[in-house]
């Protein structure tokens, strides 16, 4: 196994300038600004906040209003802050505390959980290799593992320290799975489909996978030159994200980068490519990226809700296709879609393909 330099080790080594592999291309650098100043901006578009309190209300009108708000945000932005989502605040805190404690271990201790991408062992502790669209490195380390369904997990690679990691993360994954069902139902109704339709199309209760990725973005001596994660869209159906209230997430909306605010007790939710394909482009999978900073470590906990890799062919649903709105996406399995994005797919191509 090839030893990989961890970004955390690099950040703690006392360097004042970052290695050239981390410096973004000139055309990107023009749009990278101070994240704390960006977050304070009140003018211009803001990521919507959606209150899910009434998503299952017995009052039909109240329920419909909630579904309509969720639908609008999914058609327009494809990303939102969810509040009153039903996941206990103390459970979210436990998940964050467990992840923070794991990443506070020494790099040597974390290396016991190292993944090995070269051999296909993708679960575990890792750092980005230069196999992304730009061939460059990103300012982050991470921990990745399948979190749900329980029978498909490999607990042997989950952190043993802290002791609450497995219990807190397992409980959180169960709660997110229930939340995903509520969201899928609302988004199905929003498209004029039967409530259980979208969830069935992505594998249903048996096959939908929840993959947990804890992203650790160390302090960066030259944040104006680097990105924590480069611009991409999520391949998932839905992505749910917690963070440690340090700003960094940016969305490419109406031709400009918009910095997401930190909303207490919220969960950020992205619509992923999978739902964009099924809805024939109605629901948006938005291009997004992560900024880094000099002052504070940023940590985010992303859970990707993904269909099985080969069992389902993803294509626009027949109800979403018409003479006026022909299919925008060719049929492909989830595995083929991932491959399609990994190999030579520049963002410009992705965007132009969506607009074709």
Curated annotation (Swiss-Prot):
Cofactor binding description: Binds 1 ascorbate molecule per subunit.
Protein name per its UniProtKB record: Leucoanthocyanidin dioxygenase
Residues of the Fe2OG dioxygenase domain: 208-307
Gene Ontology molecular function: L-ascorbic acid binding; leucocyanidin oxygenase activity; metal ion binding
Induction note: By methyl jasmonate, 6-benzylaminopurine, light and sucrose.
The keyword Metal-binding is assigned to this record: yes
Binding-site residues for 2-oxoglutarate, renumbered to this chain: 215-217, 298-300
Gene knockout outcome: No accumulation of anthocyanins, accumulation of protoanthocyanidin intermediates and presence of numerous small vacuoles in leaf epidermal cells.
EC code(s) of this entry: 1.14.20.4
Binding site for substrate: 142, 213, 233, 306, 341
Gene Ontology process terms (BP): anthocyanin-containing compound biosynthetic process; proanthocyanidin biosynthetic process; response to jasmonic acid; response to wounding; vacuole organization
Tissue specificity remark: Expressed in young seedlings (at protein level).
Annotated family: Belongs to the iron/ascorbate-dependent oxidoreductase family.
Source organism per UniProt: Arabidopsis thaliana (Mouse-ear cress)
Known cofactor(s): L-ascorbate; Fe(2+)
Taxonomic lineage of the native organism: Eukaryota, Viridiplantae, Streptophyta, Embryophyta, Tracheophyta
């Amino acid at each position: 196994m090839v030893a990989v330099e961890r970004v955390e080790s690099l950040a703690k080594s006392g360097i004042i300038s970052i290695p050239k592999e981390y410096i973004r291309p000139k055309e990107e650098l023009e749009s990278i600004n101070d994240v704390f100043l960006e977050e304070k901006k009140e003018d211009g578009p803001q990521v919507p906040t959606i209150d899910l309190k009434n998503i299952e209300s017995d009052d039909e009108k109240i329920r419909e209003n909630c579904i309509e708000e969720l639908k609008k945000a999914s058609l327009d932005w494809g990303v939102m802050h969810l509040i009153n989502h039903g996941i206990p605040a103390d459970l979210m805190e436990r998940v964050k505390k467990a992840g923070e404690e794991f990443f506070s271990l020494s790099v040597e201790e974390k290396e016991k959980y190292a993944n090995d991408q070269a051999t296909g062992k993708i679960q575990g502790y890792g750092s980005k290799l230069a196999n992304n669209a730009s061939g460059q490195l990103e300012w982050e380390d991470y921990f990745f593992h399948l979190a749900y369904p329980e029978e498909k997990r490999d607990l042997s690679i989950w952190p043993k320290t802290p002791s609450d990691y497995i219990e807190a993360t397992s409980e959180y994954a169960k709660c997110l799975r229930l939340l995903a069902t509520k969201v899928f139902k609302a988004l199905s109704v929003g498209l004029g489909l039967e409530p259980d339709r979208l969830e069935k199309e992505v594998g249903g209760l048996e096959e939908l996978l929840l993959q947990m990725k804890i992203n650790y973005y160390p302090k960066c001596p030259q944040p104006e030159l680097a990105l924590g994660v480069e611009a991409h869209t999520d391949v998932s159906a839905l992505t749910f994200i917690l963070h440690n209230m340090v700003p960094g997430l940016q969305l490419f909306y109406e031709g400009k980068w918009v910095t997401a605010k930190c909303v207490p007790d919220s969960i950020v939710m992205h619509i992923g490519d999978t739902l964009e394909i099924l809805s024939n482009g109605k629901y948006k999978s938005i291009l997004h990226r992560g900024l880094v900073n000099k002052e504070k470590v940023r940590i985010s906990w992303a859970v990707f809700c993904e269909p099985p890799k080969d069992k389902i062919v993803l294509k626009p649903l027949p109800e979403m296709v018409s003479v006026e709105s022909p299919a925008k996406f060719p049929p492909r399995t989830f595995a083929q879609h991932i491959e399609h994005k990994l190999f030579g797919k520049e963002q410009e191509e992705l965007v132009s393909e969506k607009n074709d």
